[in-house]
Amino acid sequence: MKKSARRQSRELATQGLYQWLLSNASSGEIDAQLRGALGYDKADKELLEAILHGVIREHATLVEAITPSLDRPIDQLSPVERAVLLIATFELTHHVETPYRVIINEAVELTKTFGGSDGYKYVNGVLDKLAAKLRPAETQARRNS
């Protein structure tokens, strides 16, 4: 099945943030490596840049938003789960044109692709709680329909 340009962007952002979390490389170094990555030519580059640079720039604020929905310290999560949660939280707060269910579904799929066997269940649960806090009107409308 062909991946959408937006899915490709999220996959590359996950890979870039994974690298950033492990190595603390600069966003410029990560950018340069991603440009040579498989699938870069098919990605929505504007979305990729917005996510990658936005998450790195707002890391502390995003962690602060995620933490109340976690059952353990964020540094105890796998780097893949952390990267995916950061991306989804960034999208929930900055890409309100994207329905929250799409963001959660994309995060679950990214975790299935790059993470451990059951990490996607945890990510789904955390993001359900987080979406209710960050987008209460949208989540309530969905639950009432």
From Swiss-Prot:
It holds the Pfam family NusB. It comes from the Bacteria. The keyword Methyltransferase does not apply. InterPro entries: NusB-like_sf, NusB_fam, NusB_RsmB_TIM44. One of its GO terms (cellular component) is cytosol. One of its GO terms (biological process) is DNA-templated transcription termination. Keywords: RNA-binding, Transcription, Transcription antitermination, Transcription regulation. Disulfide bonds: none annotated. One of its GO terms (molecular function) is RNA binding. PANTHER family: ANTITERMINATION NUSB DOMAIN-CONTAINING PROTEIN, N UTILIZATION SUBSTANCE PROTEIN B-RELATED. HAMAP family: NusB (MF_00073). Belongs to the NusB family. Involved in transcription antitermination. Required for transcription of ribosomal RNA (rRNA) genes. Binds specifically to the boxA antiterminator sequence of the ribosomal RNA (rrn) operons. This is Transcription antitermination protein NusB.
